[in-house]
Curated annotation (Swiss-Prot):
It comes from Gluconacetobacter diazotrophicus (strain ATCC 49037 / DSM 5601 / CCUG 37298 / CIP 103539 / LMG 7603 / PAl5). There is a cross-link at E16-Y20 (Pyrroloquinoline quinone (Glu-Tyr)). Pathway: Cofactor biosynthesis; pyrroloquinoline quinone biosynthesis. Pfam families: PqqA (PF08042). InterPro entries: PQQ_synth_PqqA. Belongs to the PqqA family. GO terms for biological process: pyrroloquinoline quinone biosynthetic process. Keywords: PQQ biosynthesis. Coiled coil: none annotated. Required for coenzyme pyrroloquinoline quinone (PQQ) biosynthesis. PQQ is probably formed by cross-linking a specific glutamate to a specific tyrosine residue and excising these residues from the peptide. The gene is pqqA. This is Coenzyme PQQ synthesis protein A.
């Protein structure tokens, strides 16, 4: 469980930051 927990939170966070940065550039 300890191994999957960080991944579950990391992926959506990374996607959110990615889309946010992309939106800021445009």
């Amino acid at each position: 469980m300890a191994w999957t927990a960080p991944k579950i939170t990391e992926v959506p966070l990374g996607a959110e930051i990615n889309s946010y940065v992309c939106g800021q550039k445009k």
